[in-house]
Amino acid sequence: MSPQTETKTGFGFKAGVKDYRLNYYTPEYETKDTDILAAFRMTPQPGVPPEEAGAAVAAESSTGTWTTVWTDGLTSLDRYKGRCYDIEPVAGEENQYIAYVAYPLDLFEEGSVTNMFTSIVGNVFGFKALRALRLEDLRVPPAYSKTFQGPPHGIQAERDKLNKYGRPLLGCTIKPKLGLSAKNYGRAVYECLRGGLDFTKDDENVNSQPFMRWRDRFLFVAEALFKSQAETGEVKGHYLNATAGTCEEMMKRAIFARELGAPIVMHDYLTGGFTANTSLAHYCRDNGLLLHIHRAMHAVIDRQRNHGMHFRVLAKALRMSGGDHVHAGTVVGKLEGEREVTLGFVDSLRDDYIEKDRSRGIYFTQDWVSMPGVFPVASGGIHVWHMPALTEIFGDDSVLQFGGGTLGHPWGNAPGAVANRVASEACVQARNEGRDLAREGNEIIREASKWSPELAAACEVWKEIKFEFETIDTL
C-alpha cells in the first residue's frame, strides 16, 4: 500500500494513510457466536502481502476507507469493524489465499439480504490491490437468521399441501421457451400434467411479451390445472412467473394468480433482486402460495473460481430471502455442477444443521435453527436415463424437472410425462427394495420399459445423449 504519512493536530487526530493491517488484521481474535463469518478466496496484486490484502477486504467491506478520517473518533471502531482473523494459502495455486473475516452483527439491518450483500460483496470486489476476489462461503449466525422469515412454507408444508410423499416431485419447463400463444401454451401444460407430472413451469424469460401477455397465460394455465386435476385426482401446479419490471407489477401478477386459485408462483430472484424476492416471499406465506425460484444470472456471478461468489452463498441468501424451490444444477445434465460441491449446497438448502466439511466446499458449520428448508430443483439437459442417478444424488426431497426430456418425446407431451413418471417410480421402488441405483440404474430403467411403451420410446430416443465436459468450478 502507499507509504504511511501523518499530520498531527491539536485534537489528537493524525491525518494520513495507514496500512490496513494495523487495524483490521487480528489473528488473535476469537470469533463470537453472533459474528457473520466469511471465507474469501483472494489473489493480491504482486507486492501486496496477504495480510494487507486480507485486512483491506475486512476494512473495505465494513468500517474502513483508504485514509484516516476525523469521524473515526466519534464511534467505536473496535465494536463495528470487520476483522481478518486468519489467512491460509490455497493448495496448488500461486499467490492465492483464503482470508477469513468476522463481521459484528450490528453492521447489518435485520431481515435484509440486500443490506448484508451491499457490505460483504460490495465495492471491495473492485479494489485495485486485489487481482481477484471470490466469496466462497458465509456463516450466518442464528441471531441474524432468526430475523428472516425464510421460505414461505418449506419442504414439509409443501408436501402436506400437495399430499405427495416418499418420492421426488416431477416437473417440466414448457418449450419452446418463447413464441407460443397463451392458448397453445395452456394446452402443453395440460398434456404434461395429465400425463403424470406434478408441476409445469414458465421458463425464466417468460414474463409478458407481445406474443403472450401474462394475464392470458395465467388464465389458460389455470384452466389446464383444473382440468388435469379433475382427470387425475392429484394436486397439480404450474410455476406462474410473476417476475416483472417493477415490484408493484410483480405483486399484481402474484395477486391475480392467487385469485385464480393457482397453488404456486415463480420469481427470478437474481435478476429481480433480493428486495423484490423477499417482498414476494412474505406475500406468499401470508396468502398460501408456494414460491418457485429460478437462478437466472447466477453463472455470471459464480462460475469463475477466482472471482465473484460461489453459488453456496447465493443458496444461503435465497433461503433467508425466501423461496420454496430453487434451481441447483443436476450434476449429470447440461449445466455446470460438481457432485460433492452440489451436494454441499443442497444440504445448506434442506437441512437444519450442516457441519463444516472442506471436501464438499463447506467452510463453516451452519445452524439454521427452525428455518424451513428449500426443495433443490434439478433441471437442464436431463432425461429418463438420468433418473436413477438423479434419484440417488438428490433423494426424495427434490424436484426433478425435464423440459426437453418430456416435450421431446416422439409421441408427444403426455407420453413424455408418462415416461418420466414411470421411470421415477421404478427408481424409487428399486431403491426401497435395496437395489443400488448407481450400479444398476440402466437395468432398472430397461426393466420398467418392458411394461411401459412410453418409457421404451423415450429410452430409444435419448440412449446416446450425454453431456460429458469437465467442470470449471472445482474444489
Curated annotation (Swiss-Prot):
Positions of the pro-segment in this chain: 1-2
Reaction equations catalysed: 2 (2R)-3-phosphoglycerate + 2 H(+) = D-ribulose 1,5-bisphosphate + CO2 + H2O; D-ribulose 1,5-bisphosphate + O2 = 2-phosphoglycolate + (2R)-3-phosphoglycerate + 2 H(+)
Location within or outside the cell: Plastid, Chloroplast
Keywords (A to Z) from UniProt: Acetylation, Calvin cycle, Carbon dioxide fixation, Chloroplast, Disulfide bond, Lyase, Magnesium, Metal-binding, Methylation, Monooxygenase, Oxidoreductase, Photorespiration, Photosynthesis, Plastid
Chief subcellular location: plastid
EC numbers: 4.1.1.39
Catalytic residues of the enzyme: 175, 294
Transition state stabilizer, annotated site positions: 334
Binding residues for Mg(2+): 201, 203-204
Residues the entry annotates as binding substrate: 123, 173, 177, 295, 327, 379
Cofactor (UniProt): Mg(2+)
Modified residues (N6,N6,N6-trimethyllysine): 14
PANTHER family in the cross-refs: RIBULOSE BISPHOSPHATE CARBOXYLASE, RIBULOSE BISPHOSPHATE CARBOXYLASE LARGE CHAIN
Note: The basic functional RuBisCO is composed of a large chain homodimer in a 'head-to-tail' conformation. In form I RuBisCO this homodimer is arranged in a barrel-like tetramer with the small subunits forming a tetrameric 'cap' on each end of the 'barrel'.
Function per UniProt: RuBisCO catalyzes two reactions: the carboxylation of D-ribulose 1,5-bisphosphate, the primary event in carbon dioxide fixation, as well as the oxidative fragmentation of the pentose substrate in the photorespiration process. Both reactions occur simultaneously and in competition at the same active site.
Family note: Belongs to the RuBisCO large chain family. Type I subfamily.
Record protein name field: Ribulose bisphosphate carboxylase large chain
Species this protein is from: Angiopteris lygodiifolia (Turnip fern)
Gene symbol of the encoding locus: rbcL
